[in-house]
């Protein structure tokens, strides 16, 4: 669900990360805010902002882009009124990822507008731009990256610490919370200042009823049911 321009640094690493990441991180709910700004060679700056709701409980992660109701209503009204075969718009649905005891992932999307639960088989992950990187899904980044970064002695919340890495013309900073096992802030920027990305996590109370327990009555479909 997250649309970002993070450098490859944030997207993968195979090193062990037991020093920084717990095998069983605490259950958590959060609102995540994203900001991405790029200034092109013609001098025009383009800035994007978006937010998502994020919940992690045991081996389940739920993420949902927060779309203003009038915009969602207008989109679905136009989409549903269009004649012919309907395609599934995964960006308008909540993403639900679970991991079983064998380490296998299951990807589903919950479309509250149409009361549909759409299962995505492994071979179709590319259709929804899904990367089955459990560490990054569960912790928002791969915590192994912290071992490649320099810890900083900067002011930070309790049980949190800033880390930084400079590589080429790029600088990345992460405020990692060892208590909550997530980054509270991720910043990535070019040293010339023409590209900046920021992700900020605001902790919320866990809902009284988890969203994946509110799917009674949803029609279960396969993503391939929407193919032409």
What are these regions (language model features)?
Residues 4-13:
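Sec-dependent N-terminal signal peptides
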Residues 14-18:
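N-terminal signal peptide c-region/cleavage motif recognized by signal peptidases
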Residues 19-66, 70-72, 221-228:
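N-terminal cleavable signal peptides for secretion/export
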Residues 22-24, 146, 155-160, 167-172, ...:
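Non-transmembrane domains of secretory- and envelope-associated proteins
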Residues 24-35, 59-64, 105-106, 155-164, ...:
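Short, hydrophobic/aromatic-rich segments at coil-to-beta transitions
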Residues 45, 49-135:
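An acidic-aromatic
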Residues 46-48, 136-151, 194-197:
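A short, amphipathic edge element
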Residues 51-56, 96-100, 147-156, 174-175:
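Short, exposed beta-strand/loop patches in secreted or surface proteins that constitute
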């Amino acid at each position: 669900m997250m649309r970002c321009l993070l450098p490859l640094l944030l997207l993968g690493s195979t090193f062990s990360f037991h020093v920084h990441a717990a095998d069983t991180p605490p259950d958590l709910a959060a609102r995540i805010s994203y900001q991405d700004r790029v200034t092109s060679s013609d001098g025009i700056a383009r800035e994007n902002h978006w937010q998502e709701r994020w919940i992690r409980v045991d081996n389940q992660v739920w993420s949902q882009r927060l779309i203003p109701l009038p915009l969602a209503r207008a989109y679905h009204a136009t989409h549903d009124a269009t004649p012919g075969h309907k395609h599934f718009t995964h960006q308008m649905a909540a993403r639900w990822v679970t991991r079983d005891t064998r380490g296998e992932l299951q990807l589903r999307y919950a479309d509250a507008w149409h009361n549909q639960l759409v299962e995505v088989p492994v071979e179709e992950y590319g259709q929804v731009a899904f990367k089955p990187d459990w560490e990054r899904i569960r912790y928002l980044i791969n915590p192994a990256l912290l071992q490649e970064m320099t810890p900083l002695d900067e002011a930070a919340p309790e049980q949190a610490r800033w880390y930084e890495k400079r590589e080429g013309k790029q600088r990345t900073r992460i405020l990692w919370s060892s208590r909550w096992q997530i980054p509270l802030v991720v910043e990535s920027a070019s040293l010339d200042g023409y590209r900046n990305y920021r992700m900020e996590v605001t902790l919320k109370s866990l809902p009284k009823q988890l969203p994946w327990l509110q799917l009674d009555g949803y029609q279960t479909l396969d993503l391939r049911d929407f193919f032409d």
